[in-house]
Amino acid sequence: MSTFNAETADNLEDIEKQFAVVAVEQAETYWKLLTSVPGSKLRLTKFDDEIYENFMERFPEYKDVERVKKFTEEELKTKEAKERWRKFFTIFEKKIEDYNFGTLLRTDASAEYGQFTTCFVVRLQFYAFEIARNKHGLNDWIVGQK
């Protein structure tokens, strides 16, 4: 059994840079996809409906479309929020490959990825928000953008 503890581990600069490169590449790929296809027509995983239903059930505050559209990074990072998300992750940890990889998420669905509109999250959080945004048509405005 491993004794590695992610909460107390030192971040190695090279590993951090590699994660950042992958996260940026994923964000660029997703944005390019959204410029070509309305988000409301996309499926991000074969578990989209299950992710959405569990997200709405466990985080009922996001049934308010405005909260899905725009949120603050801080509301995802509180001690209570982290615990709620950990419980959400356990549902999908054996179903979604790389569910816990770092990913960039826009904090505002009406904006592009940018310095003040992007946060670093776990991929399953990205899926939860973006699937909800897509179901509500919040990303459809992006089609045709550059």
Curated annotation (Swiss-Prot):
It is found in: Cytoplasm. The keyword Transport does not apply. InterPro entries: PBDC1-like_dom_sf (IPR023139), PBDC1_metazoa/fungi (IPR008476), Polysacc_synth_dom (IPR021148). Keywords: Cytoplasm. The keyword Cytoplasm applies. One of its GO terms (cellular component) is cytoplasm. GO terms for biological process: 'de novo' cotranslational protein folding. Gene3D superfamilies: yst0336 like domain (1.10.3560.10). One of its GO terms (molecular function) is protein folding chaperone. Present with 37500 molecules/cell in log phase SD medium. Belongs to the PBDC1 family. This is Protein PBDC1 homolog. It comes from Saccharomyces cerevisiae (strain ATCC 204508 / S288c) (Baker's yeast).
